[in-house]
Amino acid sequence: MTTHKERIQACINGELTDRPPVALWRHFPVDDQAPGTLAKATLNFQQTYDFDLVKVTPASSFCVRDWGVEDEWKGHTEGTRQYTKRVIQHPRDWEHLPVLEPSAPHL
């Protein structure tokens, strides 16, 4: 029996595999509000479908929240969020964004 890792590595190496590697992912628009619930939802999805690759899919706003952007999920099933607070109001605002540390809470 081939493991997920062996299947992916064989594919990368151009070798024959027992079947093509399969990976699907989705957003979890309610569970993505906190790292723990997102991890739990992602693991449950993987345990249910047993894909060859797991992709963690946070809310699309995770990379801007530490600058003060705020958003809200309003029920869109694909996970789209509505921005409720933007930090860029004028072109010059780009010049005043602070450099974020890699350890910032949402990064």
Q: PLM features: residue spans?
A:
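Catalytic cores of TIM-barrel enzymes
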Residues: 1-107
